[in-house]
Amino acid sequence: MSLVLDPAAQDLLFREARTANTFTDEPVTDEQVQAIYDLVKFGPTAFNQSPLRVVLVRSAEGRERLVQHMAEGNRPKTATAPLVAILAADNEFHEELPALLPHFPQAKDLFFSERPVRESAAGLNAALQAAYFIIGVRAAGLAAGPMTGYDAAGIQKEFLDDDHTPLMVVNIGKPGDDAWFPRSPRLSFDEVITTV
């Protein structure tokens, strides 16, 4: 069976896309980032929570502050990527629910009045949105280098607040020389899918 999405687009988004480890010097513009967001914001989340928040680290001072919280192996590529984004979950996302879920505004208090419930929901749904974000970066013809090797408490203190939990740091740009590691294997259909 063939998919509706053009094979070239399938390759761009999935089969040929890889995590980039080096980048060219070509800048990533605010217009590109807005185009990415304006596409991926339509990806589904439970109750339309939309808890993902993004901090773009553009300044040299901000980059220096960020690099010190990255794992040693992630520091050089984070220091040199054209753009770095900190993706975080907003644990107070429920405050936006009356606007985001106008047909069911009572969901804010009915389901999300307790902080632990919000943190769990925000983490799950922001991670889902982070995946959309990576696909959106690829759709813009750019490469993404998502990383979870960092001091989460340090990044939270430096760039966020107690209501925002860092999920990942993503380097963004045009891939540079030797950007890719060899493609790692994937599990087969039969290893993943069961039918009952």
Curated annotation (Swiss-Prot):
Family under the similarity heading: Belongs to the nitroreductase family. HadB/RutE subfamily.
Keywords, comma-separated and alphabetical: Flavoprotein, FMN, NAD, NADP, Oxidoreductase
Name by which UniProt lists this protein: Putative NADH dehydrogenase/NAD(P)H nitroreductase SGR_2476
Cofactor(s) listed in the protein's UniProt record: FMN
Organism per entry: Streptomyces griseus subsp. griseus (strain JCM 4626 / CBS 651.72 / NBRC 13350 / KCC S-0626 / ISP 5235)
A single GO molecular function term of this UniProt record: oxidoreductase activity
Enzyme class (EC, first level): oxidoreductase
Enzyme Commission numbers on file: 1.-.-.-
Alphabetical list of InterPro entries matching this protein: Nitroreductase, Nitroreductase-like, Nitroreductase_HadB/RutE, RutE-like
Top-level taxon: Bacteria
